Amino acid sequence: MIKRFVFALLSSALVTSVAHAWGHCAAGKTLTDCKLTIATGNPAYYPWVMDDAPESGKGFEAAVAYAMASEMGFPAADVVWVRTSFDEAIQPGAKNFDLNMQQYSITPEREIVVDFSVPYYSAPMAVLVGKGAVDTAPTMADLKGLKWGAVGSTTAVSKLENVVKPESAILLYADNADVNAAISANQIDAALFDLPTALFLSAVMIEGSKVIGQFSADASDNPDQFGMLMEDGNALKDCVNQALTKLAATGRLAAIEAEWLQDTTGVPLIK
């Protein structure tokens, strides 16, 4: 009786394994059979990966990775993490991963040497304020009263002129370094950046600054879009795209974004 029970369990496990190996679009297309190898940075940073521990599934990219893997038929235990530098992964040639997630913007130049999935994130515009304006509420009414700066050649200017409509003239600068310096020197109160850049500037570059709010991505002109990076010609691409498309269609992708890039960062949508 016991032998028959054990045999039944083993048979069930074997059937499940075979079903996974041969019945899914990822079958035979990964570096290691029945495993999905995903690369992240060394280290990986908040809020994309929490505490430099992608295996926890915490952080926006870590959470997206596990949700996508599940859609592709891989349980969490079959997701393998490796580390790469940002630049080495963009180089042409064979890769030691199936997918790489390090906030890679999809660009025509990069697509010459690597493949990208459909976008899993479109970076919205966010408001970065200097230390003198950190108590500003994330509302359109309050944003109008700030002194704004922007790089003259960017879409931030039209966003400010047509959407925010500040009460004082927008100060124009040659590049982002000049805008950053102006915020640091309290020459301006605020500037617009894509959310990843704004979070980085606040955490690392501009002491006392704060990201007080973000616009929805669909309200941004030509937003920066992140894709999962793959070796050029990777046969897994269609399967990855199917999984990401389903996550987007069901609202799961938006829910992950809200959890990790709005709630966790404390950067609410501007009203």
Label for each model-derived stretch:
Residues A62-E71, A133, L146-K147, G152-T154, ...:
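Extended ligand-binding regions for polar small-molecule ligands
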Residues V79-Q91, D135-T136, L171-A185:
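Short helix-initiation/N-cap motifs at beta->coil->alpha
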Residues G23-Q103, I112:
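Extracytoplasmic small-molecule ligand-binding "clamshell" domains
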Residues W22-G23, T155-L171, K210-V211, Q242-K271:
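Ligand-binding clefts/hinges and TM-proximal coupling segments of bilobed small-molecule sensing domains
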Residues I38, P43-A44, E55-E71, S105, ...:
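Bilobed "Venus flytrap"/periplasmic-binding protein-like clamshell domains
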Residues D87-E88, Y104-V113, K159-N162, D189-N222:
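A ligand-binding cleft/hinge motif common to bilobed small-molecule-binding domains
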Residues N42, S122-V129, L195, A203-T245, ...:
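Periplasmic-binding protein-like
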Residues F74-A76, A94-Q102, L146-K147, S184-T197, ...:
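Alpha-to-beta junction loops
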